């Protein structure tokens, strides 16, 4: 099987509704199943919201493989709790240019998002986040 190795995937996040909203998400996790990790990422749901000037980002997946909240690292981003009652802001619908090279995944992965919440849904989501984070 081989031992677990530290793997890093860098993903370019682009909001298809606003091309200026681009950020790099660096996912660092211990796994020896890089292909499964890539597929997990492609099927995951990304939560992101700006609350009181802070952008919260979290990848939600039911897979046993990373990513989980404790391995997400990105400049200008922080992780947030998973909402137990569901709901999302962006759904990851496409993951391209990710492949293995000498046991590593190419770091020029590109991600495209769709599914924007309405203002009322966003307000409700923001309220839930405020409660979870103790900001109310």
UniProtKB/Swiss-Prot annotation:
Supply the Pfam families for this chain. Pneumo_NS1 (PF03438)
Q: Might you name a Gene Ontology BP term for this protein?
A: symbiont-mediated perturbation of host apoptosis
Q: By its UniProt entry, which InterPro entries does this protein fall under?
A: Pneumo_NS1
Q: Give the subcellular location.
A: Host cytoplasm; Host mitochondrion; Host nucleus
Can the keyword Amino-acid biosynthesis be found in this entry's annotation?
Answer: no
Alphabetical keyword list: Host cytoplasm, Host mitochondrion, Host nucleus, Host-virus interaction, Inhibition of host adaptive immune response by virus, Inhibition of host innate immune response by virus, Inhibition of host interferon signaling pathway by virus, Inhibition of host IRF3 by virus, Inhibition of host IRF7 by virus, Inhibition of host MAVS by virus, Inhibition of host RIG-I by virus, Inhibition of host RLR pathway by virus, Inhibition of host STAT2 by virus, Inhibition of host TBK1 by virus, Inhibition of host TLR pathway by virus, Interferon antiviral system evasion, Modulation of host cell apoptosis by virus, Viral immunoevasion
Give the superkingdom in one word.
Viruses
GO cellular component terms?
host cell mitochondrion; host cell nucleus
Q: Which family does it belong to?
A: Belongs to the pneumovirus non-structural protein 1 family.
Oligomeric and partner information: Monomer. Homomultimer. Heteromultimer with NS2. Interacts with the matrix protein M. Interacts with host ELOC and CUL2; this interaction allows NS1 to form an active E3 ligase with ELOC and CUL2. Interacts with host IRF3; this interaction leads to the disrupted association of IRF3 with CREBBP and thus reduced binding of IRF3 to the IFN-beta promoter. Interacts with host MAVS; this interaction prevents MAVS binding to RIGI and inhibits signaling pathway leading to interferon production.
Its annotated function is as follows: Plays a major role in antagonizing the type I IFN-mediated antiviral response by degrading or inhibiting multiple cellular factors required for either IFN induction or response pathways. Acts cooperatively with NS2 to repress activation and nuclear translocation of host IFN-regulatory factor IRF3. Also disrupts the association of IRF3 with CREBBP. Interacts with host mitochondrial-associated membrane (MAM) MAVS and prevents the interaction with RIGI. Interacts with TRIM25 to suppress TRIM25-mediated RIGI ubiquitination and thereby RIGI-MAVS interaction.
- Put simply, this protein is called Non-structural protein 1
The coding gene here is 1C
């Amino acid at each position: 099987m081989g031992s677990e190795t530290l793997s890093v995937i860098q993903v370019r996040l682009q909001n298809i509704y606003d091309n200026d909203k681009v950020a790099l998400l660096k996912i660092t996790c211990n796994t020896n199943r890089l292909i499964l990790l890539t597929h997990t990422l492609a099927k995951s749901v990304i939560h992101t919201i700006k609350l009181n000037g802070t952008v919260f980002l979290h990848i939600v997946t039911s897979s046993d493989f990373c990513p989980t909240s404790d391995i997400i690292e990105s400049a200008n981003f922080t992780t947030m709790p998973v909402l137990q009652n569901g709901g999302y802001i962006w759904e990851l619908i496409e993951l391209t240019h990710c492949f293995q090279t000498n046991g590593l995944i190419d770091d020029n992965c590109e991600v495209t998002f769709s599914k924007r919440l309405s203002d009322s849904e966003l307000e409700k989501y923001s309220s839930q986040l405020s409660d979870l984070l103790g900001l109310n």
